[in-house]
Amino acid sequence: MLRNAPCRLLPQPTSYIPGPRLLHAVMRAYARRGDTAATLSAFARLTSTSVPDTFTTCEIPWHATDVVLEPSNTSIILAMDAMLQQRGVLASTVPQLLHFLKQVDRSWGSWRARHEPAARPMFINLRTMRHVLTWCLHANAHDEVRPVLRFQQGLLRRELRWHTSPHARPVWLQDPNEWASLRRWRHTLQQLVQRRWISERQERALYVKALHVVRHRVMGTARKMAHTSHRHIIPSSGTS
């Protein structure tokens, strides 16, 4: 399993193989060819995470490998984009996206952290959830907003519980600016308020909880940068 952490597959103890970057490179190559089936198959096979049966998949050269790569939120968004290209931005597609995110969360995210608190989780972030809410707005999927926000409320609650537990460790930040991501996500919530899909009280409650989570993420990363020695990432040339 290749995660965003030190890996002993290299001779240099200060080097590591970034599994999420490798996964993203594979998926990006398929996405640029417009091969949505291969994009979804790459995510499902390489992360050991199931994709809803309603979407088209195919065999890929990686089908016989035993390697498991940790996904990033960018890879998750690539997979969801492939789903939307297959089905279209329709209200009926949103429940499938939500089911997919629940599977990812169980395998890698806050749900896994709940049952395996000692494992370092890969949390689904605000950028990914903002994409889903934006698609709800585009598809006029009023009835699907409540399940999406209920799922996000659970994500925030479980992540906050992990951050305040004895098992908490600095998490891998995937957004260059968590605060900017928080502002954009809140702007999307305010659009839901303007359409009267949610109340101002609900928007405020979600924002406050997300604010606490972002603070823990940023504070943990600052401590990690202050105490962690420098590690070399494999350059694109393949030499270290």
Segments from the language model and where they lie:
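A basic, Ser/Thr-enriched alpha-helical scaffold prevalent
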Residues: M1-S240
